């Protein structure tokens, strides 16, 4: 196992506390492996014996017909009679009513609970009802650029970060695809299988979606328009033009389901003058850039929006709440807020014309505050400072600890 301290360190801070630790994220982003890392840390750092740890993976056939009552009875029977039991419950959303089970175990027994799930129902009102104030959640993402370089270095010679960024864009960051030297086609085969299982298990099967072709058309439109503002109406109009009529409500429903399965991230617009979240013309980003290419095929014209996608995910990984900033006559790619911190970020593949340079810098110059402002690019010699706006190569930004 290759350590992922970004998550393990944060979760370990809550070990041996009454809080239920909930790990969520897209399928195969590494949640199960992180649970194993936590188990190992508990053994080595806190001398917790293995017999005090119980691990169950509920997407196994073994638990296919299990009820919440059976889940509770089985776990209760295995608890240590004296002292604390450490419970690691993987993919618990597969058991209907798991919230009650977790609540009862946390309330009635001396347990330290860690659970994972691949659907945002994990964070639904049900959990708030049963575990109010007694859980902490951790969103797990696919590999960051830094993690990607570390994983790849275990089996191959890794190039200079600026050169490796192009590979990271194409290959994405699903951990299982970077444990050995897979080809691009082999990686896309794995990622396509992740996509298919997510669509079928977390969307079609769970929600009894019948018109799968409609869902897939919405997916492909969204994947093709990463980083563009659009609405359910614009998707419906596009499908109508293709003689595939679909009403706005159905489109909204599909987008919501894709979000709940963690395939998509919704990025709302924030009016920088009115200081309010706008409810129209949102952007959507993917859980991983390889999802796009495994479904639609690789296209060099999409690199610019994939770079934007990567920067968005990195800001989220670091705990920022991220919105698109609406200015008087345009937009800032990202306004990222974390507690009392704020940064503004513009992402452009290249600054290859005076027009591009003017567009990227002028919008940031409209903002009259002292928070950090960045223009990120893949220009080889990117750097410097222009009227307080810092220019950085995207690879340097992704590896930086300054924000």
List PLM regions with ranges.
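Pre-Walker A adenine-sensing motif
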Residues: 2-18
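Hydrophobic anchor at the beta1->P-loop junction of P-loop NTPases
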Residues: 23
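P-loop (Walker A) phosphate-binding loop of NTP-binding proteins
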Residues: 26
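Conserved lysine of the Walker
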Residues: 31-32
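Short glycine-rich substrate-engagement loop in P-loop NTPases that contacts/grips substrate
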Residues: 54-83
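Interdomain motor-coupling "hinge/lid" segment immediately C-terminal to the ATP-binding subdomain
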Residues: 120, 124-229, 262
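Accessory nucleic acid-recognition modules appended to NTPase machines
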Residues: 183-342
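Catalytic cores of nucleic-acid endonucleases
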Residues: 325, 349-395
